Amino acid sequence: MAKTASAMLFLYLLLSRCLLSHAFQEFITKFPMPMMYNFPSCSSTIPSTCRNETAIADTCCFEYPGGLILHSQFWNAPYRKRSYRDFGPDDSFTIHGLWNDRCDGSWDQFCRRGSSIRSVVDILSKDSLNRGGLPITGKALLRQMSMYWKGDRGDENLWVHEYNKHGLCLNTLRPECYQRWGSVASAEDQAIYDYFRIAMNLHLKIDAYHALSRQGIKPRCDAPYDAVRMQNALADDFGREVQMQCTGNRLTGVTYYYLLRGGILSENFQPVDPTQSSSCRGKIYWIPKSGC
């Protein structure tokens, strides 16, 4: 009798365990646990890009043949009073792109054409990039980009162009690198997310508008500024020279230059002087976005 009772108890416990296991599997299928974002771990002995004396074998932790990282920003303003276009916040430059130049200032473009994309919104809106476990959700990132990454032919047209032309040339964002440290989405989607996330991070850290305004330089219509004064204000804030772009005698953009320690996902950016000269000379106008 005792043996029968023990056997029945054993069967009951086994059945309960199976039922609980099945219920748990159904639960995690319907409500998947967010995967944690795995940042890559690269050797501390890897040199900065463009500073290595020998070839670096770990191509997921060393950006090559690029390695001179440029963060380019627009200052778009109408020639006359505000047009229908949205130029972004009045007190902020907007993003042009994040570029991966070679150490000599030349660059590759439209790499890995088979991985080109047609939509950024569709990818960043996917459930896999909005479940949590990420530094910022894909949809929140899109909201930031819609404010600070403006294109004159539509924002998404610019985003797609920048990723296909420059993002796909960042070799430390290759799919095989994500196989090494994991991702919360497909490797291809994760790379797209990371390109735009890192570009936004850099933009939010480096504020050219306030670097100038702290030196008493603000957009105005009635008088030009000395280009050297503006250049010095930007350099004081960044710690290195900053490349300024002008169209005629109007300021239209700035570009910050960096070297990189570790892969692009490390975000270990090291400011350096530009390899290209500024195109702004003499007296230049910084036009308000509201127009003149």
Curated annotation (Swiss-Prot):
Any Gene Ontology biological process:
apoptotic process
Kindly list the places in or outside the cell where this protein is found, as annotated in its UniProt entry: Vacuole lumen; Cytoplasm
**Per its record, what are the GO molecular function terms?**
ribonuclease T2 activity; RNA binding; RNA endonuclease activity
Where are the disulfide bridges? C42-C61, C50-C103, C60-C177, C111-C169, C246-C280
Task: Output a single Gene Ontology CC term carried by this record.
Answer: vacuolar lumen
Gene3D superfamilies in alphabetical order:
Ribonuclease T2-like
Q: What is its EC number?
A: 4.6.1.19
Q: Would I find Cell membrane among this entry's keywords?
A: no
Signal peptide segment: 1-23
Glycosylation: residue positions: N52
Catalytic residues (positions): H96, E162, H166
Keyword check for Glycoprotein, yes or no: yes
- Segments spanning the bilayer are none
- Reaction catalysed by this chain? a ribonucleotidyl-ribonucleotide-RNA + H2O = a 3'-end 3'-phospho-ribonucleotide-RNA + a 5'-end dephospho-ribonucleoside-RNA + H(+)
Please name the SUPFAM superfamilies in this protein's record. Ribonuclease Rh-like (SSF55895)
The UniProt keyword set, sorted, is: Cytoplasm, Disulfide bond, Endonuclease, Glycoprotein, Hydrolase, Lyase, Nuclease, Signal, Vacuole
Main localization (coarse): other
What does the protein in this record do?
A: Rnase which modulates cell survival under stress conditions. Released from the vacuole to the cytoplasm during stress to promote tRNA and rRNA cleavage and to activate separately a downstream pathway that promotes cell death. Involved in cell size, vacuolar morphology and growth at high temperatures and high salt concentration.
What PANTHER family would the database entry show? Answer: RIBONUCLEASE T2
| Family to which this protein belongs | Belongs to the RNase T2 family.
In Swiss-Prot or TrEMBL terms, this protein is called Ribonuclease T2-like
* Organism expressing this protein natively: Eremothecium gossypii (strain ATCC 10895 / CBS 109.51 / FGSC 9923 / NRRL Y-1056)
Organism classification: Eukaryota, Fungi, Dikarya, Ascomycota, Saccharomycotina
List the gene name: RNY1
